[in-house]
């Protein structure tokens, strides 16, 4: 349910350590289970309804809903940051009873006009498509044809073609009641044509576009002028329709820039009816040296659109002629808002800006390397490492049911995927996204509760559904965060790879936070488990699986020849490693004692042998 994007981590914000613990105790059935040292009371939970609260519905309805009458408000007397350029057209008052202007580029050059609207139903994913559309149609005053009905995260969305239909649909909002007695909210937004209706440029048209762009490129200034590209005479004469507020066309233009003029420093996109900047988000990657950007005389309504391109290191920006300029009370607030996104900006709308307020900062220093594991004491080190070795030997096996012994009856567990610009596309983590409980993105309280796994049976059933893995125990870094007589909190960070399915051999990084209580005399029992998963960085990939962990086995030391047993005992004594890891080292070196010793010494000097290898 969570979206791509910058990194926010989930947290168990609605529970405490002892919640839901059962008074029932099971006798130990292995290394994990045993009698608890402490009892914790069951806390009641007010589960509430299954739908959103009324305040949340009002927020969703108000956010982004637009009037059907027009796309521009009448003059409001607000401060216009800078005067118009000499060639700027006079301001016209638009009547509120007129249809909104065509900004989608969906019409033809001969004056034909098609206005599209996106219809959004918050939390619509919980409704059946047939029931939802028929319920809306029964109350809508005009018949409508939904185009491209789909679910986007927890929302249902589709498109309609004209303002009359959109207005009629708006009247249906809150008139439908679902079986949970919640009102169905309908939000209307003006939109570009649906993606399936946006014309893709043909290969020969793309070649002509390249020729057109080459004529508009000034190599000496490294400047590309795409002002009013749709009405370029060369393109019009060949009936090539390049509409830059359509994603397909903008992507072609950005690809041409990336492949031919990545050194671009100045780009003019004025007079192209741009009303959003989502499609320019990759510009900072494709033209990293861009310093001048002209977005004047477009239809940008909010300064928040600039957030989508704030990765650019701009020195000059043009925004005059956009509706967003009318929303500032004075010049200083306008400059401040823009400079917040582009701190190195020197000129705005052709005007020199006052120098930015800067503070003396120390010269950059190299951060110290991350330290290794922290346990607090040798006793805790032995306890935690033994627990992790047992836990992940089962977790990496073909059957994770053995983890039932590791969890308390009232345990809680959740999974979260961080979001951020540096993260790869979400499809590389598809098996995890459906269960992600990232509270920065997931606002629906019902889904937050649903994605929180309660009781050890549900926790282990959930873990069994996750992809099969092999963890690189040599990558583990463990930090003991808190310790009392009845509770232990520790985090483990490391690397694993998937061993089957579509993402086989994909390497992931993880951080796992365990809260555990004593079990038996020497064991631990998990009451709270938070798992964070992301794709491994290039540096993590380079270091991963340098010394593979031994394959989990029910018999750690299989039958060996007498000579091999003597060699194994001697190697374990000299290296200090346990028998399992000593045998692994000898086998990897074909039982060549001398070579195994050299490899061990080298890996130990490099810090690549995990601490569990020395746990006996």
UniProtKB/Swiss-Prot annotation:
Show the segment(s) annotated as Disordered: 1-115
Residue ranges, compositional bias (Polar residues): 40-56
Entry's Pfam families? LRR_NXF1-5, NXF_NTF2, Tap-RNA_bind, TAP_C
Q: Which GO terms describe its molecular function?
A: RNA binding
Q: Where is the RRM domain?
A: 116-195
What Gene Ontology cellular-component terms does the record carry? cytoplasm; nuclear speck; nucleus
User: Basic and acidic residues bias: where?
Assistant: 1-17
Q: Where are the LRR repeats?
A: 263-288, 289-312, 313-340, 341-368
Q: Name one GO biological process term.
A: poly(A)+ mRNA export from nucleus
Source superkingdom = Eukaryota
Q: Which Gene3D superfamilies match?
A: 3.10.450.50, 3.30.70.330, DNA helicase RuvA subunit, C-terminal domain, Ribonuclease Inhibitor
Query: What does this protein's UniProt record list under function?
Result: Involved in the nuclear export of mRNA from the nucleus to the cytoplasm.
Listed name of the protein = Nuclear RNA export factor 1
Organism, as annotated: Coturnix japonica
């Amino acid at each position: 349910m969570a979206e791509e994007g910058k990194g926010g981590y989930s947290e168990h914000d609605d529970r405490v350590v002892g919640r839901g613990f059962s008074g029932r105790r099971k006798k130990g059935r292995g290394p994990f289970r045993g009698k608890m040292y402490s009892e914790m009371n069951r806390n009641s939970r007010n589960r509430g309804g299954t739908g959103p609260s009324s305040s949340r519905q009002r927020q969703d309805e108000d956010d982004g809903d637009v009037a059907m009458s027009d796309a521009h408000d009448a003059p409001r007397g607000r401060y216009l940051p800078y005067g118009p350029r000499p060639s700027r057209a006079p301001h016209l008052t638009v009547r509120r009873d007129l249809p909104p202007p065509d900004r989608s580029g969906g019409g033809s050059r001969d004056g034909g006009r098609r206005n599209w609207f996106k219809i959004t139903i918050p939390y619509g994913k919980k409704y059946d498509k047939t029931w939802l559309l028929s319920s809306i149609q029964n109350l809508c005053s005009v018949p409508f044809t939904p185009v491209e009905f789909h679910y986007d995260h927890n929302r249902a969305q589709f498109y309609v073609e004209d303002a009359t239909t959109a207005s009629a649909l708006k009247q249906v909002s809150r008139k439908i009641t679902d079986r949970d007695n919640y009102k169905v909210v309908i939000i209307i937004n003006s939109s570009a044509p649906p993606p399936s209706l946006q014309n893709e440029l043909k290969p020969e048209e793309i070649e002509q576009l390249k020729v057109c762009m080459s004529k508009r490129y000034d190599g000496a200034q490294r400047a590309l002028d795409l002002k009013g590209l749709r009405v370029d005479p060369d393109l019009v004469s060949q009936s090539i329709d390049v509409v830059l507020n359509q994603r397909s066309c903008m992507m072609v233009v950005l690809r041409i820039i990336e492949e031919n003029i990545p050194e671009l420093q100045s780009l003019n996109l004025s007079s192209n009816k741009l009303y959003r900047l989502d499609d320019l988000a990759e510009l900072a990657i494709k033209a990293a040296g861009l310093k001048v950007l002209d977005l004047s005389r477009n239809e940008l309504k909010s300064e928040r659109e600039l957030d989508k391109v704030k990765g650019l290191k701009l020195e000059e920006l043009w925004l005059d002629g956009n509706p967003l300029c009318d929303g500032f009370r004075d010049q200083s607030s306008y400059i401040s808002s823009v400079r917040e996104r582009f701190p190195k900006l020197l000129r705005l709308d052709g005007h020199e800006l006052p120098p930015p307020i800067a503070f003396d900062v120390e010269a950059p220093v190299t951060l110290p390397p991350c330290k290794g594991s922290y346990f607090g004491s040798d006793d805790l080190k032995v306890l935690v490492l033994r627990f992790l070795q047992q836990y992940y030997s089962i977790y990496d096996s073909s059957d994770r049911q053995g983890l039932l012994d590791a969890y308390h009856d009232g345990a809680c567990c959740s999974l979260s995927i961080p979001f951020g610009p540096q993260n790869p596309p979400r499809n590389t983590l598809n098996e995890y996204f459906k269960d992600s409980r990232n509270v920065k993105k997931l606002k629906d309280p019902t889904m937050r509760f649903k994605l929180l796994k309660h009781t050890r049976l549900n926790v282990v059933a959930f873990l069994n559904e996750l992809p099969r893995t092999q963890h690189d125990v040599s990558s583990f870094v463990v930090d003991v965060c808190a310790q009392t007589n009845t509770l232990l909190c520790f985090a483990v960070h490391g690397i694993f790879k998937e061993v089957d399915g579509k993402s086989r051999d994909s390497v992931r990084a993880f951080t796992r936070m365990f809260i555990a209580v004593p079990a038996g005399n020497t064991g631990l029992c998990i009451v709270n488990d938070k798992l964070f998963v992301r794709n491994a960085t290039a540096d993590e990939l380079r270091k991963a699986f340098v010394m593979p962990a031994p394959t989990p086995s029910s018999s750690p030391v299989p039958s060996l020849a007498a000579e091999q047993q003597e060699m194994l005992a001697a190697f374990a004594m000299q290296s200090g490693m346990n028998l399992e890891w000593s045998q692994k080292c000898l086998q990897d070196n074909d039982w060549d004692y001398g070579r195994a010793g050299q490899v061990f010494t080298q890996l130990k000097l490099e810090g690549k042998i995990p601490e569990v290898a020395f746990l006996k």
